[in-house]
Curated annotation (Swiss-Prot):
The modification 4-aspartylphosphate is found at D57. GO terms for cellular component: cytoplasm. Keywords: Chemotaxis, Cytoplasm, Hydrolase, Phosphoprotein. It comes from Natronomonas pharaonis (strain ATCC 35678 / DSM 2160 / CIP 103997 / JCM 8858 / NBRC 14720 / NCIMB 2260 / Gabara). One of its GO terms (molecular function) is phosphorelay response regulator activity. This is Protein-glutamate methylesterase/protein-glutamine glutaminase.
Amino acid sequence: MSNNGIAAVVVDDSQFMRTVISDMLDDAGITVVATASNGESGVEAVRTHEPDVVTMDLKMPGMDGIEATGRIMDECPTPVLVLSAHADDGAELTFEAMDEGAVDFFKKPSGEVSVGIKQQQDELVEKVRSVAGADVSATEAAAERTTSTATSTTTSRSASEYVDKPTLVIGSSTGGPTVVEQLLSELPLDADLRILVVQHMPDGFTGRFAKRLDGASEYSVSEATGGERIGGGEALVAQGGYHLEVSGYGGGRLRVTLTEDEPVNNVRPAVDVTLQTAAEQVDGPLTAAILTGMGADGADGVESVSAAGGSVVAQDEETSAVFGMPQRAIETGVVDDVRPRNELADGVLDTIMRE
């Protein structure tokens, strides 16, 4: 899809923000076909103009962005990019919108005239392009507030069937949060996994994401702060703005470190960094799972995991909102299994079964 081929609707109750966002997109050649000041008029604009992508504010009078996102998914399915305030309640509302089917989110531009505004514009435009290319049909399950345990196809197994001290690294980006949540919710505690989650997400949101995963999973999930040692039954989420490195391994416990090294694949945290350091350090069963997302992050890392004797599972195209990261991983030739979203847990568990 060329820049000129992308049509956008901008929904925000602030005229100032509508102007800022519209100007950013217009400058990049993305056509803003309509703007709206509340959710109801936003839904109508989407119905009328049939855009490729919607940028959606959350807090608006009348119909808010969460309800509007749900209505759009029900009535005229269109990729939605949530523009979220950087605050605790903003993070929670953002995840509620993603439950309704929003593909991704972006921290709302401050609107301040500063040297950082150009970088904000570049990041917003990249997000809009990514979301515009998303397959909304692949994310429709998210709009039903996934009750994954009720619909899980995960095969029942006994604890004695699993290998000892397995480690799982999950990497995802666009469209990933609800898929990660479903995957973790379907992994039994009996598997005794040590889990690292690298989701492309800014600081201020990864902590809330970890809390959601903790509530959805049998595993104890927290945001990495650096220096932790985790064992079986525990999971860490990479903190936004930091790479998550595996810096040591002993007695079945992982030690992790956060670094502010340069972005890799234009992102930080990068899946490749975690996978490559895990491949170097983990002396035990290691599995990588590459989920929906734009770009090639994780492709180099899965080669390292495979070379170290580990296993690789990737999400299939049909259920990926953006089949970028899984496709690039598959193209390396080292992926052992490709599974749809509701079979990813089974795919992971198959890699840690005793022979």
